[in-house]
Amino acid sequence: MARPPPLLVQKPSFLVEACCSPSPATHLAPYHTQPGARTPSTIQRDLLFPIPRRCHARSSPRPPALGGGPTQRLQHAARSAHPIPPSVKEIHPTFSEIPRARASDCCAAALGVQHWPARHPHPPLPSISLAVDYYLLGQRWWFGLTLFFVVLGSLSVQVFSFRWFVHDFSTEDSATTTASTCQQPGADCKTVVSSGSAAGEGEARPSTPQRQASNASKSNIAATNSGSNSNGATRTSGKHRSASCSFCIWLLQSLIHILQLGQVWRYLHTIYLGIRSRQSGESSRWRFYWKMVYEYADVSMLHLLATFLESAPQLVLQLCIIVQTHSLQALQGFTAAASLVSLAWALASYQKALRDSRDDKKPISYMAVIIQFCWHFFTIAARVITFALFASVFQLYFGIFIVLHWCIMTFWIVHCETEFCITKWEEIVFDMVVGIIYIFSWFNVKEGRTRCRLFIYYFVILLENTALSALWYLYKAPQIADAFAIPALCVVFSSFLTGVVFMLMYYAFFHPNGPRFGQSPSCACDDPATAFSMPPEVATSTLRSISNNRSVASDRDQKFAERDGCVPVFQVRPTAPPTPSSRPPRIEESVIKIDLFRNRYPAWERHVLDRSLRKAILAFECSPSPPRLQYKDDALIQERLEYETTL
């Protein structure tokens, strides 16, 4: 079958940037323009079809996580260094105002620094003071456990934070080096999407799809950086760092993390970026705004990990001590209350930061954040009270239960095929850490519809809470009367029920995408391409350009096909005659056959690829309905529909 005419007419690199394909065999279109040259048409293209980024690599799917580094922040920073031309403002009024850092975002970061000693384990003053009290009272066992949880959470978070810094620093250096190479006279800067390094070397073959996606993002960063070197701030960031400057940065960051101040540094950096965003002009406001959003998402992820590595075990320990001693000290109560609030707030604030950092997700309102906080507060309270009651009687069996539950949850998370990190080993470490979170609360690690997984998780939690509470009541100490035992059991089950009610309220009334109940999987969310429309001016000029460049484009495609020595990746053929089935009849459409395996890419990259292809084809062909995508492994149709319903 003859290769169809290309979809690109003015700048063939559009599909490369739009699809963000990390395939080593994909040679879509090289650059035919001088690197750095930007015309009104290319600027309109960038604004009408923003380059899909990997969003937050350390997030639930994005970002988001250990070894994957943060989202490629320079991608938006480089592109936004140019002010929006008036012609584009007239076509798309939504781009007329570049967002600034809101005062609420800056206040949230400031509150994180202000309440850092009480909520973050770097160092948590109440826990350290309590450990000192245990040591002075001769309770060496309680002193050791309290101090161990403090050190465990602090060191783990500093290691994660420094690992992210290393990845960010190396990625930025790689991108700036590539951009500076392309800016040299006579340099061959043809962009070919491959799985090589950021410089485009096709010989390097990463071992994991995550690494392919990361390198592809680096290539896009280098390409966008080379196109925005006219701005002063971007030009400064694009210069290759000297050896002395790099050494100073490494030394400073090493000292900060050795002193256990990695989170404080990131919070202060977030506030600084927010202030710069509000004070900067229109040309660089977008750049600082998105850098602030991504930095706050990173520090929220660190807060989440630190909280569940330190505050959650600390809370169970203090409640167990209170039950065993039948006494409550003021410092114990304050530490337990602060830990419980920190656990619930960590989950709610992370969801807020995650949605703010992803332009494909609707932002979550502050009322929804409060509802989420209440949901996690009551469910975690029921969980830790149950643990404390059971551990006060069965210390050994409680440890066995925790290890067994953690192993089961970790295997479940691994089975979900999370894709937060670069390497497989880092992914396993991250899944093990998330398994600790699953001991206490629900944490979504997979894109798509989570109704079934959410129901299974809370059903298991309810069974465990019931079994542990019943065993404690049957084998409790004789001095514990029913006047204490029965109210304790009532608190456990009423708190769990209250948390479930708040969860249902969130999904029924406060979810950003609207009510999530009563929707069938097939129509839960329409494809975003159906709502995509182009301005009449752009659509008319696009059709005219396509009709005028048919012959030239076909010759160029034939040349590229002969050079590559492989079959075309994208083929368009008419829809096959429909076969009798239970599905309702579909509108007549074209099927795009993609000669690639979809499952070889990370989940978010697959979703970006689908969405970008539809938008590009729908925009340039002006089809009344979006085309359907068919992969080689299209037997798993439900998986594709699952990601399509997340927009």
From Swiss-Prot:
Pfam families: XK-related. Residues 193-238 are annotated as: Disordered. One of its GO terms (cellular component) is plasma membrane. The modification Phosphoserine is found at residue 197. GO terms for biological process: apoptotic process involved in development; engulfment of apoptotic cell; phosphatidylserine exposure on apoptotic cell surface. Residues 207-236 have a biased composition (Polar residues). Belongs to the XK family. This is XK-related protein 4. It comes from Rattus norvegicus (Rat). The gene is Xkr4.
